[in-house]
């Protein structure tokens, strides 16, 4: 960011924070806080207010009616992946610029309050090299690498200093290669970064690998909220990967991982299954992946829920899983923009991505939404051979100065969600009387304020009337826009 851009960014986030405080202090004045972004960037996380009014009996039917007595899932948070590439780019920035960006992104009082991030356990396809944390055979050789020590941990510590409420979920892309075999029939050693399967003989060592990582992070004042067992377990490609069918994941959790985390002092770290696409990559034997594991009570006792990506299938699978096991959680852990989906075209991506990542995931019972890389350079880098060479970050940074930034759709989506939906919020009922060009989801925060997210897919300004018990407010939705409302206690 240039100094001018830094100043502008801070002004926007500070204005949002100040308006938020004002809205909270002036609830008797019925001030509704409004955050607006449009595809043409004329509104760019812009802050406004409107006013709650007493209902007039002559009013027409409201477009949206909020129903706080109808309650659904509790929300954990929203954020992006803090990959090795993200950390590298952040570390190239001047410290003051980096702090300004992280404050705008994560601070609850001076920014948008993003609060749930994903990190890789070992390398990902956006690391600086291929590696695990135990590349020398023998679990006693587990050790953090320079990528953790010099990049990931300092960045996480800086984020947590800004917002201690930020939660972290960790996911491995592969087990150490000495733990892998070519398949579970031949059991031949498989010294490759991609594909292969976990040798059942090393289930205990691999469970210890997770526990040692959790302890190493804790030793650096970083408490991890949750893990997934394998990133994209049905993907044999990428720069690092490992195939893990549902039967393998079941056996690993049931026989080793669950009790190992418990015995090593991490009984409260949540274990999420799967971490892959809604359509199970169209592999017939892997469909309903988490359901097979939930049906085994000895494995299921250790499992919090299931994580999904959206590179295949639809969000209807979320409700399909929820309806079968409503006590198990759902979280969304990865989506990327890139060349394939015109990722830097905000006019196209803004409303599409909020619909897909914000409205449909949350209305289908997700408790958290996390997108892929927070920050990549203008080339979508650093990245790895055989990994994604066409991905963009939620934010782009120019390598010419490591200052100039462009925020892309995923940054807007997550900021719009996190700014008004607080940790511990509960999704509430909503009656939407508009056409299918107006999409919405609503929540009650722990302080009893209400959060409403509205997507206007119309290409013209659209008047909106929202009813909340015996009050209502109006707002003119700009064309092709995403709007977040924070509504005071009634």
Regions inferred by a protein language model and the residue ranges of each:
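N-terminal catalytic cores of secreted or lumenal carbohydrate-active enzymes
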Residues: 45-224, 245, 255
């Amino acid at each position: 960011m240039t100094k001018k851009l830094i100043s502008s960014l801070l002004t926007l986030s500070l204005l949002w924070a100040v308006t938020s405080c004002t809205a909270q202090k002036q609830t008797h004045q019925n001030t509704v806080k409004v955050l607006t972004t449009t595809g043409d960037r004329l509104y760019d996380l812009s802050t406004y207010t409107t006013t709650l009014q007493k209902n007039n009996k002559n009013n027409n039917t409201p477009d949206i009616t909020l129903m706080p007595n109808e309650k659904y899932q509790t929300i954990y948070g929203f954020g992006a992946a803090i990959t090795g590439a993200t950390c590298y780019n952040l570390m190239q920035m001047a410290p003051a610029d980096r702090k300004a960006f992280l404050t705008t992104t994560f601070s609850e009082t001076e920014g948008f309050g993003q609060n749930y991030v994903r990190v890789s356990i070992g390398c990902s396809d956006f690391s600086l090299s291929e590696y695990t944390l135990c590349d020398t055979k023998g679990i006693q050789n587990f050790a953090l690498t320079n990528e953790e020590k010099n990049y990931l941990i300092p960045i996480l510590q800086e984020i947590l200093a800004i917002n201690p409420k930020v939660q972290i979920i960790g996911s491995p892309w592969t087990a150490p290669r000495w733990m892998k075999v070519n398949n579970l029939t031949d059991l031949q050693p498989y010294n490759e970064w991609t594909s292969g399967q976990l040798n059942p003989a090393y289930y205990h060592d691999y469970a210890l690998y997770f526990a040692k990582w959790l302890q190493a992070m804790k030793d650096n004042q970083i408490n991890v909220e949750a893990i997934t067992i394998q990133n994209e377990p049905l993907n044999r490609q990428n720069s690092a990967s490992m195939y893990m069918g549902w039967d393998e994941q079941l056996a690993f959790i049931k026989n080793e991982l669950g009790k190992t985390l418990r015995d090593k002092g991490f009984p409260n770290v949540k274990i999420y299954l799967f971490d892959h696409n809604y359509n199970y990559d169209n592999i017939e034997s892997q469909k309903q992946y988490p359901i097979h594991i939930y049906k085994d009570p000895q494995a299921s006792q250790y499992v919090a829920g299931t994580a999904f990506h959206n590179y295949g299938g639809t969000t209807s699978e979320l409700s399909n899983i929820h309806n079968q096991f409503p006590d198990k959680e759902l979280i969304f852990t990865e989506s990327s923009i890139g060349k394939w989906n015109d990722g830097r075209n905000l006019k196209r991506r803004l409303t599409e991505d909020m619909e897909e990542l914000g409205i449909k995931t949350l209305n289908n019972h997700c408790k958290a939404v996390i997108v892929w890389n927070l920050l990549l350079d203008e080339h979508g880098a650093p990245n790895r051979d055989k990994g994604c060479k066409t991905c963009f970050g939620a934010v782009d940074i120019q390598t010419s100065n490591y200052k100039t930034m462009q925020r892309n759709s995923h940054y807007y989506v997550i900021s719009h969600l996190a700014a008004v939906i607080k940790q511990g919020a509960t999704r509430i009922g909503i009656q939407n009387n508009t056409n299918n060009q107006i999409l919405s989801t609503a929540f009650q925060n722990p302080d009893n304020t209400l959060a409403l997210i509205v997507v206007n897919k119309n290409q013209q300004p659209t008047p909106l009337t929202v009813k909340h018990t015996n009050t209502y407010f109006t707002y003119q939705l700009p064309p092709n826009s995403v709007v977040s409302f924070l509504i005071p206690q009634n």
